[in-house]
């Protein structure tokens, strides 16, 4: 199955999309990667969903990516007498280490790390920013605040600290357990929630040890400030606009989205734009015009993928949401302005032989209007380099590793085919031509460009480029 677009679609699975039949329908509608949110999914259910995805993969003979989204260290209040209280603007409110139920003057804050790092003047946001507090005094077991925006506080509501870097791991005990379970069933991507620093990525990579790629969810101001360092260590980025819009002013989120999309492309790392992209389609079969524009803007900016959350997980129209996103992407990419924007954003290649080869492949393919750029890749690095250049020609990645194909499912423009490794350079070119014809990317009489690393099978050794003419024999296999 060949997609008629370059941007990829990530669809979240949930109650509305947890059957094998629905997963197959979502894939047919356009989903390239399936996300499993471990905040709402048990390990047993996660294993079942991965099994269903792999069944669809076998039935369609197409690599499908599986993304596990870890819950992360969510900060929460304790409980309240009666379950809820009202706090008024201007009142004093205390957060302390006493586990007794709270009232209109105080509440239990169970994370001791907060008390030693928060400072006067810092902000606390409760229940996604509905209640805002400013710190007046900070003591080892007690924080005195002033209520800036009052409202209702109830049991175990979430707490956000946009000004405070908290000295704890991005992997809670639940996350470590979920990650190990996910690695055992062969997931492809793991998304880390609420990261603050590059060390959070390094910690996760010590656990994954190459068994899964690591995606950094940028949803805290602290992570935005250290974006360059995080990009260096992460394998991909997610613009997690939900919590990001809680912890920083909403009007700043679009600029951060553009900054991340641009930085990811320069680094050759995939970028996924997420949260509320087609939110109204939870209850409506058609999106709002603003939502269509939001998805289109992300694609115009050059995002590798756009993501559906509740729309596909818990909405009434999951298949329609995926199909709508698919149509928007196809329409945007057919616009002449899209190609102009993509070309204008192209950065100079890194000063390496592999990056020079990828840049040359793009220039040759564009100049000669070649049918496809075909990459032989073991680790996926060759395909990533070519995708960074955003050629007009389709990118076909050939890999002997199914795990590589699955990880590349989130990368802009890459259509991956799993095939045995080439025996020599002649076999490499001949098989590339046959597969390009078989997958409907080329016809006899057209030309393709083949990019690879020699010796064959050496990860990251992109050093060969060859223009190949497709003969009539290529259509016979």
Task: Give the ranges of each region predicted by the language model.
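Non-catalytic helical/linker scaffolds that mediate oligomerization, partner binding
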Residues: 1-477
């Amino acid at each position: 199955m060949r997609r008629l677009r370059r941007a990829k679609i990530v669809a979240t699975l949930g109650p509305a999309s947890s059957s094998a039949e629905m997963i197959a329908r979502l894939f047919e509608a356009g989903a390239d990667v399936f996300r499993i949110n471990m905040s709402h999914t048990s390990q047993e259910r996660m294993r079942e969903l991965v099994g269903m995805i792999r069944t669809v993969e076998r039935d369609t003979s197409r690599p499908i990516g599986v993304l596990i989204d870890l819950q992360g260290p969510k900060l929460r209040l304790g409980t309240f007498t009666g379950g809820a209280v009202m706090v008024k603007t201007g009142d004093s409110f205390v957060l302390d280490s006493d586990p007794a139920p709270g009232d209109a003057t105080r509440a239990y804050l169970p994370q001791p790390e907060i008390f030693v790092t928060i400072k006067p003047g810092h902000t606390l946001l409760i229940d996604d920013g509905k209640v805002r507090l400013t710190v007046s005094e900070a003591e080892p077991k007690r924080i005195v605040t002033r209520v800036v925006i009052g409202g209702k506080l109830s049991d175990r509501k979430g707490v956000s600290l946009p000004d405070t870097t908290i000295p704890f791991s991005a992997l809670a005990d639940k996350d470590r357990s979920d990650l190990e379970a996910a690695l055992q069933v062969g997931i492809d991507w793991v998304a880390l929630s609420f990261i603050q620093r590059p060390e959070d990525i390094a910690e996760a990579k010590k656990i994954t040890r190459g068994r899964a790629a690591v995606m950094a969810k940028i949803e805290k101001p602290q992570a935005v400030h250290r974006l360059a360092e995080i990009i260096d260590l992460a394998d991909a980025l997610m613009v997690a606009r939900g919590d990001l819009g809680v912890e920083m002013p909403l009007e700043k989120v679009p600029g951060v989205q553009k900054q991340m999309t641009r930085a990811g492309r320069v680094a050759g790392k995939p970028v996924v734009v997420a949260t509320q992209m087609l939110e109204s389609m939870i209850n409506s079969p058609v999106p709002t015009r603003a939502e269509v524009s939001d998805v289109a803007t992300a694609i115009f900016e050059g995002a590798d993928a756009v993501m559906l959350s509740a729309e596909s997980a818990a909405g009434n129209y999951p298949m329609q949401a995926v199909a709508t996103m698919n149509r928007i992407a196809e329409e945007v990419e057919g616009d002449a302005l899209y190609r102009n924007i993509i070309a204008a954003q192209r950065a100079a290649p890194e000063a390496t032989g592999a990056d020079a080869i990828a840049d040359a492949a793009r220039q040759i393919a564009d100049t000669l209007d070649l049918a496809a750029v075909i990459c032989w890749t073991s680790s996926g690095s060759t395909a990533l380099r070519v995708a960074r250049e955003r050629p007009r020609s389709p990118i076909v990645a050939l890999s002997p590793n199914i795990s590589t194909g699955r990880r590349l499912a989130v990368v802009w423009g890459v259509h991956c085919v799993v095939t045995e490794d080439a025996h020599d350079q002649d076999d490499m070119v001949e098989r590339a031509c046959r597969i390009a014809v078989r997958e409907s990317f080329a016809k006899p009489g057209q030309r393709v460009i083949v990019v690879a690393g020699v010796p064959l099978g050496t990860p990251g050794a992109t050093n060969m480029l060859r223009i190949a003419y497709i003969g009539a024999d290529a259509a016979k296999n």
